[in-house]
A protein has these predicted regions:
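N-terminal, Lys/Arg- and Ser/Thr-rich interaction peptides
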Residues: 1-25
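Charged, low-complexity interaction tracts
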Residues: 2-3, 41, 45-160
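Charged, well-structured alpha/beta interaction segments
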Residues: 20-53
Length: 160
């Protein structure tokens, strides 16, 4: 009868078990955050590229943001903590907080999410400037590449 002898199979099985155990928290988490960072950087550059004005309409719709609005968007933009939704690991990019423009209606300052939505989607008095949509679409391939590199790097660490 023939006899087969495998060397290193126990080590390989151990590595696969470690990979499975580290997948959710380590590999997937670092991969998702790597892609989110690339997209977040693109959105930050898009916010910095928004034209600045005094916030008053001249001959039509407002097409600018004020300096406090722009600063509020930059300060309030961020990445949420990772969330597990039925096995799908997600992070969200978004705006939080208030800017320094205080009004009677907004005594704490204008909500950054309100300004971001009105600039991105437009209103009856503001021209549409799709800065978030353009940034997300333009950074999609770079985000996928960053995620692929991060995933490979994390798997390589475990499989050594």
């Amino acid at each position: 009868m023939a006899k087969f002898q495998f060397e290193g199979i126990d080590t390989y099985i151990k590595q696969l078990n470690e990979l499975q155990a580290a997948t959710k928290a380590g590999v997937v988490g670092k991969t998702v955050y790597a892609g989110a960072e690339v997209v977040a950087d693109a959105v930050r550059r898009a916010i910095q590229a928004l034209p600045v004005g005094d916030g008053r309409a001249r001959d039509g719709l407002i097409s600018t943001v004020t300096l406090p609005q722009k600063a509020g968007l930059l300060d309030g933009f961020g990445i949420s903590p990772m969330d597990d939704e039925d096995g799908f690991m997600n992070v969200k990019l978004g705006f939080d907080g208030y800017n320094a423009t205080r009004t009677k209606k907004y005594p704490r300052g204008q909500p950054n999410v309100l300004i971001a939505r009105s600039v991105n989607s437009g209103t009856t008095f503001r021209k549409k400037t799709k800065f978030v949509d353009k940034a997300v679409n333009s950074s999609k391939k770079a985000a996928e590449a960053a995620m692929d590199a991060a995933c490979s790097r994390e798997i390589e660490k475990i499989m050594k």
